Amino acid sequence: DLSELNISSSFVEWHGHTADKIIFCDGYHLQHNPWFSWLPLQPVQGDILTLKTDHPLPNEIVQFGKWLLPLANGQLKLGASWQWQPLDEKPNEKAALDLLDACYPYFPHLRQAQRLEHNVGIRPGTRDKQPFLGQHPEQSNLLVFNGFGSKGSLLIPWHAERFLRYFTRAEPLPTSADINRYTHDYFTR
């Protein structure tokens, strides 16, 4: 609960834990963060299916507008859908059927696959498809590392290294990810 944070100009305290800085990595919940809600987040919901088949699967991830990730024991993940509204974190049967329909031309044997799970998540997308990195314009001990959307697993390692250098060595952030690109147009006191 963000209301339980005690923030001063020199420290941040929460439940007896004190730190010099706090980094918000709160996904699509950033839109409710009182310090960073001004950033133009564009969350999007996505469905992913876990299936099981008796047929052989490829040895690598397959991309065909959607993706198929082979797992062990005939299991696989199939994803992902895009849904702008509603953002309710509830499995969408139409999205599941669309995922299946998209894969059947490439993997017709999956028509007989068993559906094990139907998971939903909300991606923290951004207006310009670039992440949000940096410090609050007025409170330098509040930082954000967010907005990686559907490319988090690809983008986070590289950006994490740049972010670490930013607040340990004072190296500049990549301008494409620095939240200063939005301060003039979106931040109000």
Q: Could you say what each language-model-derived stretch is?
A:
Residues D26-S140:
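Active-site substrate-recognition segment that forms the wall
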Residues F11-T18, N33-P34, Y106:
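Alpha-helix C-terminal capping segments
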Residues D1-H15:
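A conserved short coil-to-beta-strand element within the FAD-binding core of flavoproteins
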Residues H17-H29, A160:
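Short hydrophobic core segments
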Residues D1-S3, N92, D178:
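Helix N-terminus capping/helix-initiation residues
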Residues V12-G16, L78, L143-F145:
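Generic recognition of long tandem-repeat/solenoid scaffolds
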Residues A113-R189:
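C-terminal catalytic lobe of FAD-dependent flavoproteins
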